[in-house]
Amino acid sequence: VTKLDVRRALRLALLGVLMLPAAVAHADPPAPVPQPVLPPLPLGAAMRIGPTAGTGTPTRDYGVGATDLCEFMEFPSGLLQVCGDSFAGQGVAFGPHYSPIALHVDMDSVDDATGVRYDGVTGTDKPLLADPTPPASSQLPAGIVAINRENYMLVTTTKDLVPATSRLVKAVPYQGNWPTVPKSERSATYAGGRQSQISGYYDPIPTVESPSGWVYIVANNFDRSAPVELYRVSPQKFTDRSSWQGWSGLPGGGWNKAPTPLWPDQVGELSVRQIDGKTVLSYFNGSTGNMEVRVADDPTKLGTAPATTVVFATTWPDQADELPPPADNQLAQPYGGYISPGSTLDELRVFVSQWNTLPQADNAPYRVIQFAVNPFKP
């Protein structure tokens, strides 16, 4: 074998390597596989599936008689719903208090037309978070971002529901003591006070600026005093909050600018997911009191996307725990609005909280109710 033969062989080997398809970033497929569980809903219509957690539900069997929020967190080993201030009794401030907690979702129930069921809880016998709660304060879940089943949660520390600080924690399935991500804590005034509540998703489609795609994040103020703003960050830099790039819709704007509101309404809790290539945002509209969803071709178009009302806010009935017929989507004091795994663009399943704060009500019901909606689409 001559040196020329060796060089030719090396060239051929190198050419073969160069012709191999490039490695492409990818997101884990959804689990369970999205599918409808109800008869088809008319466009724009919503249907109540029923209460799932809190007052009057079987979560009392796990020492959780009253709870709210219940945002989903997916792992290869199962599914959690992270809830906020929770109590052993049937209303706020009744019995021992825990916050946050994680309900263990029975996976077979996610696509059950009668609603989600649970088979356990983490956070009642020992804290869910590693960092202790400051005196007279609460540590509340303020948004979950999953990057290929690696789950991060924003925790906002509040006093009387007024935000003081926010930080990222790394979730550990079915265990407590979730650790704080180093250097992720910020004052509630960070980013103009409009980054104490978030939601996000990972889109692996590569771009020139980020070959591994982007994590898209919607953010606002925990106290519902501000509109929604949009950020993106490469998945490798997500935990560095200073690297989040804002989106500006102003002339000459775009990415890596000071963020501007996607639309003017004041917004509360947020839940954004990518479903069948569309960006889907569920949220509490603090300007109207209603629960709404928007579907857009990409996150920068959420502000101009049509809004579908999932729940219309109304007054409390004489019997506060009574609910109207399932097709009547009126509910007193709704908030939350977290998107369920298994949702499709024609049947988006949303978990809405309800808390009776009337002076005569003893802070009950305090619960989470599952709805389905067929939202308007672009």
Give residue spans per PLM region.
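Secretory targeting and sorting signals
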Residues: 1-28
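A generic alpha-helix preference that emphasizes hydrophobic side chains
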Residues: 15-16, 22-24, 69, 141, ...
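Beta-rich carbohydrate-recognition and catalytic domains
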Residues: 30-62, 74-135, 146-194, 210-265, ...
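Beta-propeller and closely related beta-sheet repeat lectin domains
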Residues: 68-71, 126-145, 196-206, 268-271, ...
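Catalytic cores of extracellular degradative/oxidative enzymes
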Residues: 304-305, 333-337
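Substrate-binding cleft of secreted/luminal carbohydrate-active enzymes
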Residues: 349
